[in-house]
Amino acid sequence: MPTIKQLIRNTRQPIRNVTKSPALRGCPQRRGTCTRVYTITPKKPNSALRKVARVRLTSGFEITAYIPGIGHNLQEHSVVLVRGGRVKDLPGVRYHIVRGTLDAVGVKDRQQGRSKYGVKKPK
């Protein structure tokens, strides 16, 4: 506990909140161009080949974004929309690509949770 004299000398510093998705610069989503599309393995105890893309955003940042869903059509120079949201078992992946917008098509034959994967209602 500081004394009154110590508080006069230098005031308390406000706690600065640190953003979990700095590359979005306070925007809900950002547009970007894929520079590389590849797979990486998750950390223990999980095992898989997770699809990710290296994306150069309009804000100037180069980030790694996860491609959700089964199957995708993304390749180099694809224009994608990126939202925040990390992938727990992939260190360094703090963004998701939004399916069903720009060059990222929705997941094929998706019946449930369609809105999260950019799929229209089946007829």
UniProtKB/Swiss-Prot annotation:
Major localization class:
plastid
Keyword presence, Nucleotidyltransferase: no
* Keyword Ribonucleoprotein tagged: yes
Summary of the tissues where the protein is detected: Expressed in all plant tissues.
What GO annotations for molecular function exist for this entry? mRNA binding; rRNA binding; structural constituent of ribosome
Q: Where is it localised?
A: Plastid, Chloroplast
Return the CDD domains for the record. Answer: Ribosomal_S12
Looking up InterPro entries in the UniProt record yields: NA-bd_OB-fold, Ribosomal_uS12, Ribosomal_uS12_bac
Q: Which UniProt keywords apply?
A: Chloroplast, Plastid, Ribonucleoprotein, Ribosomal protein, RNA-binding, rRNA-binding
> Which PANTHER family would you find in this protein's record?
30S RIBOSOMAL PROTEIN S12 FAMILY MEMBER
Additional free-text comment from the UniProt record? Exons 2 and 3 are cis-spliced, while a trans-splicing reaction is required to link exons 1 and 2.
- Role of this protein: With S4 and S5 plays an important role in translational accuracy. Located at the interface of the 30S and 50S subunits.
* Family of this protein: Belongs to the universal ribosomal protein uS12 family.
Describe, as the record does, how this protein assembles with itself and its partners: Part of the 30S ribosomal subunit.
Q: What is this protein called?
A: Small ribosomal subunit protein uS12cz/uS12cy
Q: What high-level taxonomic lineage is stated for the organism?
A: Eukaryota, Viridiplantae, Streptophyta, Embryophyta, Tracheophyta
